[in-house]
UniProtKB/Swiss-Prot annotation:
Gene3D superfamilies documented for this protein: Aldolase class I (3.20.20.70)
Enzyme class: lyase
Organism of derivation: Aeromonas salmonicida (strain A449)
Gene: deoC
Protein name in UniProt: Deoxyribose-phosphate aldolase
NCBIfam families assigned to the protein according to its UniProt record, in alphabetical order: deoC (TIGR00126)
Job description of the protein: Catalyzes a reversible aldol reaction between acetaldehyde and D-glyceraldehyde 3-phosphate to generate 2-deoxy-D-ribose 5-phosphate.
């Protein structure tokens, strides 16, 4: 298997296959779940809005893909600083059956100088997840922009108990970048290598995915790169990976996540 095909296969098995669109419907989520059981194997998870968790669970079970985890989003996409609402949404997501919750860090409050609300929100949402769901925290690196802010936000999230730190919502102009990824993974290495990393948005093909995988291996080691600690958040990536692996045609360039 070529290096590119190897990267494509690994990326597929590490993917949180995502639909987070305003026009999502039950049928679109059913279709997404069916895609998660691909000709080249299962994706790690699907990532959907909370209201679709029951239909996703039912569909994955029916198609023999119950091992695909269900991730959802809370405090999304704006990262407000109302802890009570973020916790209520997270608790509801877990009650609905989410295996993983991707919560948005209150990055604007943080940029305005309030570190405490971010720490408190992540800590409270982690408590709401208990031992039932992983907590993945989106720090919105494309808005933070500065290395020092990306580094500090990553540190706060890890200190507050995040299971993963994630670059982006996919709802702002700049999503995952290699520069932000390096900073975040360096913080993980320094503070707690059990914490996972998820680049989201902007990972368009096997070559780009391979760059992130190589960087993760360089910083944290080959053994670290598994679905337990590394995911790609993506929607259009899957078709490109399947084409690289010989399943279907390469898609036209698509924008967005």
């Amino acid at each position: 298997m070529t290096d590119l095909k190897l990267a494509a296969q690994r990326a597929l098995n590490l993917m949180d296959l995502t639909t987070l669109n305003d026009d999502d419907t039950d049928q679109k989520v059913v279709d997404l779940c069916r895609k998660a059981k691909s000709p080249a194997g299962l994706t790690a998870a699907v990532c959907i809005y909370p209201r679709f968790i029951p239909i996703a669970r039912k569909t994955l079970r029916e198609i023999g893909a119950a091992d695909v985890r269900i991730a959802t989003v809370t405090n999304f996409p704006h990262g407000n600083d109302d802890i009570e609402i973020a916790v209520a949404e997270t608790r509801a997501a877990v009650a609905y059956g989410a295996d993983e919750v991707d919560v948005v860090f209150p990055y604007r409050a943080f940029m305005a100088g309030n570190e405490q609300v971010g720490f408190d929100l992540v800590k409270a949402c982690k408590e709401a997840c208990g031992d039932k769901a992983l907590l993945k925290v989106i720090i919105e690196t494309g808005e933070l922009k500065e290395e020092a802010l990306i580094r500090r936000a990553s540190e706060i999230c890890i200190d507050a108990g995040a299971d993963f730190i994630k670059t982006s919502t996919g709802k702002v102009p700049v999503n995952a970048t290699p520069e932000a990824a390096r900073i975040m993974m360096e913080v993980i290495k320094a503070k707690n290598p059990k914490v996972g990393f998820k680049p989201a948005g902007g990972v368009k093909d096997a070559a780009v995915a391979g760059q992130y995988l190589a960087m993760a291996e360089e910083i944290l080691g080959k053994e670290w790169v598994s679905a337990r600690t590394f995911r790609f958040g993506a929607s259009s990536l899957l078709a490109s990976l399947l084409a690289t692996l010989g399943h279907g045609d390469k898609p036209a360039n698509t924008s967005g996540y």
